[in-house]
Amino acid sequence: MSLFAPELLSPAGSLRAMRLAFAYGADAVYAGLPRMSLRVRNNSFDHEAMAQGISEAHALGKRFYAVTNVAPHNNKVRTLIKHLAPVVDMGPDALIVSDPGVIWLVRQQFPGMPMHLSVQANTVNWAAVKFWQEQGIERIILSRELGIEEIGEIREQVPDMELEVFVHGALCMAYSGRCMLSGYFNHRDPNQGACTNACRWKYEARPAREDEVGQWEPVVIEDKTRPGELMPMDEDEHGSYILNSKDLRAVEYVEQLTRMGVHSLKIEGRTKSPYYVARTAQVYRRAIDDAVTGKAFDPSLLFELE
């Protein structure tokens, strides 16, 4: 028996990337105007390109979500709504939003416009999902920090809400007060009120060195008052990386997410190359199709994403 097939949602930083995403199996793309969608660089979408993209997507029977997940300050609110009006007129399948004020304004100005809650809203529990459901949000893009079990519990608690999950791409280390440093060094989570202000410690960098058995140890950062508590700093031919998370790659969990009834599997990467968009769409398309038809996961897909 075939399973419900989740939507494969790919990033689009350009019309070319959008077309390749669809050609290689994406069901939908997400894109936005640079100043409204947290992607100022490597984003060629203006109003004309947005209109063309939405038109092409619908002609193919695909979906196009317009990203509007910026958190505007007072002096940007009217400008945001002004620039959003023509986008709504283009007929995107939904707006991706994060700010409660923007959600309220969209409801006032554009009643009936579907809205998906951005990952920027940091939705990490089923109670928050129910809250946003009551506000008229049609889909929740869950926080990228959630594990499989947590996603499953949310699905069970709120079975009638569309859930979207990031399965591939870059992971942010911190976002406005949601720092990871304290949790990394001494397991005191700032998001639970236990921050130790690790950002204010005095650090020293210890150079890479060869240990007693001939293995190279990476550059590490050490707090002067806490000897032995080390944070690695990776280096390669391109430079040094501090607080650089490894990318998310959850292709091996596609079957589990499909069985849970997750509605959409999302790939990060609106600033990535068209090749990246095409390749990731191709691999995740195969993983979804295999999961839906009951085929065992093919481990070779892991290496195709290296």
Protein language model regions, located:
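Conserved nucleotide-cofactor-binding alpha/beta core module
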Residues: 126-127
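Active-site pocket-lining/capping segments in soluble small-molecule metabolic enzymes
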Residues: 2-123, 141-142, 150-264, 271-306
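As written
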Residues: 136-137
